[in-house]
Amino acid sequence: FSGIGVGYLFSIRTSRDPFMCFSATASFLTAAVTGLSGAAAVSRTTERRELPLAAVPLFFAVQQAIEGALWLTLPVAAQGTTCQALTNSFLFLALIFWPLYAPLAAMAMERDPLRRRLIGACAVVGLGAALYLASVLLDGTHAAIIKDGHLIYDSQPPPSGAVGIFYLIATGLGPALSSHRAVNLLAIIVVLGSVVAYVAYWDAFVSVWCF
C-alpha cells in the first residue's frame, strides 16, 4: 500500500509524470489472488485484534479491481461519470484510506504499551496526510487516461511531494514498529522496496509497485 501511494505522491510533479499499471487482465488477476488470500487470512484469524491486518489483502483486491474496471471503461466512456467515480474511488483508497488504516491495523495487534504509543503517533501523522490529501482530491480535478499502454492518473493541482514523507511514516514506519516480526518485516520490505523502485524504475515506479 505504501508503494502505491508514495509512488503517486512522488511521481506527480507535473501532469506528464506517470502513475501507471499494466492491464485489465493483470489488475483483475491481482485482485483475484489477493482477494482469495485475504479471505483465507480472515477466515483463519482467531483473535479480533488481528482482523484489521488480515483484511489488508481484501482492500488491496478492491483497489486492483477498480483499476481493472478503469481499463475496460476508459476506451468507451472516458468522460463519463463511471470513469470519474472509479478514478475517485481508486485515489481515495490509495491516498486517504491507507495512511489511516495501515498504522491502525498495526496498532490493533500490538500489546506492548510503548510500541502502541509510537504506532499511534504514526497514525496521527497518517491522519494529517490523509486530511491534506482529501483536501487536494476535493479541490482539484482528477482524471485517468490510457497512454502508451499504461494507466495514468493526472491531478491538477498536483499534491505536494513532501506529503509523501508523512505518508511513508504512516504506512511504512507504523507497521515497522510492531513487535510482530511478520508485520515489521513486511513493512521494512515495503519501505526499502519503494526506495529501490523509485531510484531504479522512475518512469515505471508504480507499474513495478502495483504487483
List where the protein language model places each region:
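Hydrophobic transmembrane alpha-helical segments in integral membrane proteins
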Residues: 15-34
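Hydrophobic cores of alpha-helical transmembrane segments in multi-pass inner/ER membrane proteins
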Residues: 28-37, 94-107, 163-175
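Alpha-helical transmembrane segments in multipass membrane proteins, preferentially the mid-helix core
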Residues: 36-41, 139, 154-188
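Internal transmembrane alpha-helix with an interfacial aromatic "cap," most often the third helix
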Residues: 38-42, 68-122
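Loop-to-helix transition at the N-terminal end of transmembrane alpha-helices
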Residues: 49-63
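Central hydrophobic cores of alpha-helical transmembrane segments
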Residues: 55-59, 185-195
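Membrane-proximal helix-loop-helix units in multi-pass membrane proteins
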Residues: 105-170
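Loop-to-transmembrane alpha-helix initiation sites
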Residues: 205-211
